[in-house]
């Protein structure tokens, strides 16, 4: 409709110019032709912009349509964490229930006993250290590296579930898709899809043909303390119903803590991806465990 309206306006404008020039000199007639040509140029530009907008929306819709329908994602995994000069690899398990919890359990090799648990819920972050019988429970504003990134549960959930996200929104709706920008002029296999929100910049790289997200980048601009960045790379996609889920996720976080640049890498390699729902989404911490300060979350993770 917008294209048709633009054409009608252009035709009307040309007609008015022709009528105005009927009793005028040749010079005025020439001016009418120039103005008519300008109108045609403007119409072509408007049409091109409309087509580009439709292509942008169609691609973003393709990316959004790749999200899995399952309520639960569960699977044993190999967990690797590199931070503070340490490199730790242990067996583990990833359990996620949509809109409720993201849980990472770490086990003692061979024995299989749980040594630690990292849990994200809509209201808090929970870290349980079984070896030292300690735990951290805090909301997202109390955890330094999450606060720096401006990350909450729903943004984390979208990143773990290999989906697009709109900051501050629980679920991306069809009307939200217009907020994303897809750089279809890129010639690479993956197309950048981005959205800005205040000091936050989110960018995904999605396959041009399938729309499947291969990488996500989150950047938080902070002039006072320096930028923070979170990069995720997805691979080894496995079938979950009619959709695909990345069994391997590699995350790199760079930020400033205590006025020093810090980098942490977290790698998850799931051996299988299941949709089992026979598990409790809430962790009850024993009264024998001591609650400690949430200030040094990375330190607590590395001490497990």
Stretches with model-predicted labels:
Residues 101-154, 158, 291-294:
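An acidic-aromatic
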Residues 65-73, 83-88, 95-97, 118, ...:
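Edge/loop elements at the starts and ends of beta-strands within beta-rich repeat scaffolds
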Residues 2-11:
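Bacterial N-terminal signal peptides that target proteins for export
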């Amino acid at each position: 409709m917008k294209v048709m309206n633009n054409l009608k306006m252009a035709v009307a404008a040309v007609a008015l110019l022709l009528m105005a020039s009927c009793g005028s000199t040749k010079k005025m007639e020439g001016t009418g032709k120039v103005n008519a040509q300008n109108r045609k140029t403007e119409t072509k530009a408007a049409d091109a912009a409309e087509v580009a907008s439709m292509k942008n929306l169609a691609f973003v819709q393709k990316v959004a349509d790749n999200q899995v329908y399952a309520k639960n994602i569960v699977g044993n995994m190999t967990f690797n964490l590199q931070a503070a000069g340490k490199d730790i690899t242990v067996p583990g398990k990833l359990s996620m229930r949509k809109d409720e919890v993201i849980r990472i359990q770490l086990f003692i090799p061979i024995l299989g006993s749980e040594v630690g648990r990292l849990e994200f819920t809509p209201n808090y972050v929970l870290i349980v250290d079984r070896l030292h019988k300690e735990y951290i429970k805090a909301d997202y504003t109390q955890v330094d590296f999450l606060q720096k990134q401006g990350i909450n549960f729903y943004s984390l959930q979208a990143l773990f579930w290999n989906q697009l996200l709109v900051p501050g929104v629980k679920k991306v709706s069809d009307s939200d898709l217009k907020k994303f920008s897809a750089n279809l002029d890129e010639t690479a296999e993956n197309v950048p899809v981005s959205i800005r929100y205040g000091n936050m910049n989110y960018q995904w790289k999605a396959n041009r043909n399938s729309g499947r997200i291969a990488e996500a980048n989150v950047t938080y601009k902070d002039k006072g303390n320096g930028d923070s960045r979170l990069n995720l790379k997805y691979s080894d996609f496995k079938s979950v119903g009619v959709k695909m889920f990345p069994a391997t996720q590699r995350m790199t976080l760079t930020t400033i803590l205590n006025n020093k640049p810090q980098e942490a890498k977290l790698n998850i390699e799931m051996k299988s991806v299941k949709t089992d729902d026979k598990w409790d989404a809430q962790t009850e911490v024993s009264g024998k465990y001591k609650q400690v300060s949430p200030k040094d979350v990375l330190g607590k993770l590395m001490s497990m």
